[in-house]
Amino acid sequence: NLFLINVTKERNFSYGVWKNRQHIMINIKGGNHIGWGETKVSSNQPDFDMSAWSGQFKKLKGMMLGDAIEEVRNQFLAGNWKPIVTEGLLMTLYDLMGKIENKPTVKIWGLTGEAPVPGIFCILEREETMVVKQAQIAVDQNMHRYVKIKMFGDFELDKKNISALRKFLGPDSFIVGDPNQGYKHVKDLQKLSEIMIALNEAGMDAVEDPSNLSKEDLIYLQANVGKLSIIPDKIMRPASKSINYFDD
């Protein structure tokens, strides 16, 4: 079963605006159990066609659970199915497997770590007043220890919003800036380093994808921004390829 959810909360990015976005909830039944999953499938398409989207994986119906998981993985690794299909499907299938075996998925995978993984509250606003308003929601929901704020590649705007967020949250919150490569207009890495240091001084603890950077660029930047943490994102996807790229 598929359920389309239209989310109408506006989201602002350095590259544009999501007026709305479309998520699909998936459930798959096996025996007396139901597995659930979710994936974001599009943005600014309120009339998204679920039938066309789901047509490619109808072949999974009737398969044994392990075979279905293997098929989804193989289709992804072969480049036939995109992550917007495979992520939700694998989430659903592993949820179903965990319920059938009465085990957490991490145990099925043979993982032994049990350290908590913090959730991160995301703020996607351009206006300072709205940034603070969202920060108040994070505090109200006890999700203010780790906060991500969208940035726009505009130094003065980003600095103003980060400063306001730090002032509101205080010194104990970890603030991650995410410009979605919004500073790619800054071609000189030393200049980019100086901008990142200034944003760190304004209150930003880490930054994700400040520009379109190679592995070597990331290494250089991290070595030249003091205590600020540089977080690669786009270059890490898909993990099936980046694991080899970063293992050199």
Label the model's feature ranges.
Residues 188-189, 220:
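Short acidic, glycine/serine/threonine-rich loops at helix termini
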Residues 217:
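Glycine/Thr-rich phosphate-binding loops of Rossmann-like dinucleotide-binding domains
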Residues 1-184, 190-200:
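N-terminal capping/lid subdomain adjacent to the active-site entrance of alpha/beta enzymes
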